[in-house]
Amino acid sequence: MRVVILGSGVVGVASAWYLSQAGHEVTVIDRQPGPAEETSAANAGQISPGYAAPWAAPGVPLKAIKWMFQRHAPLAIGLDGTSFQLKWMWQMLRNCDTRHYMENKGRMVRLAEYSRDCLKALRDTTGIQYEGRQGGTLQLFRTAKQYENATRDIAVLEDAGVPYQLLEAKRLAEVEPALAEVSHKLTGGLRLPNDETGDCQLFTTRLAAMAEQAGVTFRFNTAVDALLQEGDRIAGVKCGDEIIKGDAYVMAFGSYSTAMLKGLVDIPVYPLKGYSLTIPIAQEDGAPVSTILDETYKIAITRFDQRIRVGGMAEIVGFNKALLQPRRETLEMVVRDLFPRGGHVEQATFWTGLRPMTPDGTPVVGRTAYKNLWLNTGHGTLGWTMACGSGQLISDLISGRTPAIPYDDLAVARYSPGFTPARPQHLHGAHN
């Protein structure tokens, strides 16, 4: 089967890889000159299934009001003048209760756990290298209340069979030695030993090269104007004067998927702006060993070989990609506070990207009402974490194979009134 994939970020390239391995003839189209040039370029580097959770959570509405008056707030909102933004924020608010949070987090963890299993299998099979580490993730708490609230997430982790360690402040240095210098600022941490890290752009670039060697065609520097519809099918992709045809089409344009699908499929995917710093290592013993998540500021600090990646923030401001100095100052403040000797912060590279976010946090992966149009988008801050699992899942569905995990509640149909999954849903990934 000829499959056309729109988008060469980590999700699009992973989809191309798994589809090509399933025997399909795959073409990837992207406006950029190469893979992973936008949202996948400089993300936080975490592969953290256990921390897969929606931004829509109990207490967030009140916190959002408080954050409006804080200098280093993790969330900021700026009206972009569209009714779509207002509708999206209203849908997000409706998911900020305990029932929705547990349901959304459960299916996110399910896909993320499966995705990590797929990544491990890919690594074992191909030997792909991307400055990856398998040292776990440590979520840091600065207040007693944060430490106490960890029990809510632990309940989901236990249900999903995800190993964890709840650590008091004095034990944090056992897993991250450099934190010994700042343990007095912390109340404890939640460690997920099975989580991983890695350079997403490096992974995507190398996987794209492997996919090309396997027969995948990449059409870079090619802007997509429209999807052409004929009845209940997509007839082709219009790129300037050219029409690229396939038997099946996969939408993996991230935040730009919504506009490209307008008039065809209504998906609630909105750009969530984030920032990162990439910092050269200064002192090895003062740098993180694996990856840290600061619960207060919602900022991740990840170790690559000779670099530290600091990523976070969430701005609901539309397609605004301006690099704002106050956001840089927040990232610098957090990394200096936790790892004062770790990196040459003054030499950092500052970056911003748009994460494709759904109001319930779960990506949109699966079929549409069109017989040959499939979606693989809306992964939010977890594109790197969920890419391989989403790619394998979409490959299985297009190939007519039964996926290894429940998938009905990942499709866009879940937003339809009265939707109920076609089969029982579980949190467990393929490893269980």
From Swiss-Prot:
**UniProt key word Metal-binding:** no
Query: Under which pathway is this protein filed?
Result: Amino-acid degradation; D-alanine degradation; NH(3) and pyruvate from D-alanine: step 1/1
Gene Ontology terms: cellular component: cytoplasm; plasma membrane
Give one Pfam family, short name only. DAO
* Family label: Belongs to the DadA oxidoreductase family.
Annotated FAD binding sites: 3-17
Q: What is this protein called?
A: D-amino acid dehydrogenase
Q: What is its EC number?
A: 1.4.99.-
Q: Which cofactor does it need?
A: FAD
Keywords for the protein's UniProt record, in alphabetical order: FAD, Flavoprotein, Oxidoreductase
Q: What class of enzyme is it?
A: oxidoreductase
Q: Name one GO biological process term.
A: D-alanine catabolic process
The reaction(s) this protein catalyses: a D-alpha-amino acid + A + H2O = a 2-oxocarboxylate + AH2 + NH4(+)
Q: Which GO terms describe its molecular function?
A: D-amino-acid dehydrogenase activity
Task performed by this protein: Oxidative deamination of D-amino acids.
HAMAP family annotated for this entry?
A: DadA
